Amino acid sequence: GGEGERIPAWCRRVVQDEETKIFSAQVWQPKKPYEFKKKAFKPTKSPLLIYECHVGMGQDAEKVGTYREFTENVLPRVVKAGYNCIQVMAIQEHPYYGSFGYHVSSFFAPSSRFGTPDELKELIDTAHKNGIAVIMDIVHSHAVKNEMEGLGNLCGDPCQYFYQGG
């Protein structure tokens, strides 16, 4: 129970191997980390007009979109339409894309299928530069019980993160 290689529950970057489909923790240390251009963003005091979006599905192309594509192609349309906030869905790492991001495996890691942590930071920074607040749609009760890439049986205790029989 709980033996073997596991992804740490607090990991901040998880990637999936294209061939084996196995997820692994990864240290993200770019030579030049992203520096936010908009240092102190404050959202508007007027009511939020929220555009709910999914980075992977918010594309014209029939593929999983990226943070960069969203920043370049979708965000300008959101700004032009007059929204002052985006609510980004499915942002945490999740093994099954069809879950719409609600079977979270790594709560502290942004989904690597959309790009790098720095590309996500650039998306947020660009939104802020355009006066757009960013809300992350994070649902703490939607975790996968998977043992390979999730929190199931993490330390040999199936009840550490989940109720028995749930």
Can you say where each PLM-predicted feature lies in the sequence?
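The feature marks proteins involved in alpha-glucan
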Residues: G1-E52, M57-E62, E69
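Substrate-binding/active-site clefts of carbohydrate-active enzymes
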Residues: K39-K45, H54-G166
